[in-house]
């Protein structure tokens, strides 16, 4: 019997090692995009850029690794906005084979979790490829000059349960970027289910 997206992802997350993000390529410039948000607006990098930095997150609706840290992401992004860092989330998964990641479900997911940041759809997957995004969630933290300074995790997960022992790695790193324009030297990779690439 065929498995729906989340079941497949959960199966993958228990039996297959999650994909880890590569080491931060410090100084790499952010790439421009023009993508539709769940509110029906076409947004570019210039539209979402923050005064002190910008956080670009590749996520999706169904992945258990994303769901495990959604609460942290939402809370962290609110705190970051207060210090001049804007955030944006992008879903690039193949919605045809993973209907839980459809645009309609993106709208639902963003409302249910009270996203205070835009949630964009990358239907062609071009932007995910340009950024070399590998998994969900995959975080790209940029300084005010749009130079990459963070490519790490939100926080530690034990069996898909967040270890909440103070501020998250993501929040601490982005706060440091807001203050110094530089991310931490030591970063622990994010990990999750691979982006669901289209096969045709």
Show the residue positions of the predicted features:
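Single conserved hydrophobic/aromatic residue that forms the stacking wall/gate
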Residues: 1-13
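Short cysteine clusters
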Residues: 9, 63, 193
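Extracellular/secretory pathway and lumenal proteins
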Residues: 12-13, 67, 197
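Chalcogenol-based redox active-site neighborhoods
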Residues: 16-178, 183-186
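Disulfide-stabilized, aromatic/cysteine-rich ligand-recognition loop
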Residues: 183-200
